[in-house]
Structures are given as C-alpha cells and as structure tokens.
Amino acid sequence: MPTTRETILATLHARLQTLAALALRDEVLPERIPAAGLIILRDGQPGEPEVTLSPLRYHYQHRAELEVVVQAATGRATAFDTLIAAIGTALDADRTLGGLCDWIEAEAPASVDLPVEGAAALKAAVITVILHYTTTGPLA
C-alpha cells in the first residue's frame, strides 16, 4: 500500500496529466519541448511536521515543485500565461485532491526567458505547490 505522500503526489501528477502540456514526474528535461508546453512535477520535501498527540498525527506542509517550460519563436509569453492559468484552474478544481489533502496551494511563479542557440527561446518557471496533509507517522 503506498504512503500518504506517494498517493498525494501521484494524484497531483494525474491531475496535471489532464492538461494539454506534457506532464512528467521526476524526469530529466527532454531534448524537445512539446508545442503545448512541459510540466515536470518534482516531489520536493515534506519538511518538518507539526506533531499532535492523542491520537498521534504528523501534519506536513510538503513543498513540491512544478517546472513549467514553453518554447516558441513568437507568442511565448501568451503560451506561458495560458499554461500557468491552466495549472491554476486544475488546482482550483479540487483543493483537497479528492480528500487526500487538507489543502493545496500554488505560489506565484517567477519566470525567466532562456535563449537557445539555433532554436526558439524557452520561457520557464518553477512553481512551488504546498500540500497540507496529515499522516499517522513519518513513513506512513
């Protein structure tokens, strides 16, 4: 049986796969960026939990990251904005991931344009997604 953390991350990845962009999990950046864009979910770190006793529970604010990349000769800013908005809509649709989390929220992206020699430039950002959830133990 998978841990709470793995179940939540797999569900988040499945949610991102419904978008037009290619959604990967903990993969290396591919050589080619799909026309619709690319999202790579990085599992991130659960951090130090707050612990409550009776019953014993571990409350995490897990910080996962989404690496978001679009590549286009023209309209790169619009394509990037469209992809960011689609991610926001997907997260807003169910902020508990079907009851697995207490709450999920994304932080604002800080984007950067990256020139590519001999190809269209990239626009990329890392979006931190904070997953608030509770487990019965650090390894549960």
Regions found by a protein language model. Give the residues of each.
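Charged, amphipathic alpha-helical segments and their flanking helix caps
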Residues: 1-33, 44-140
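Conserved short beta-strand elements that form part of the metal-binding/catalytic scaffold
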Residues: 41
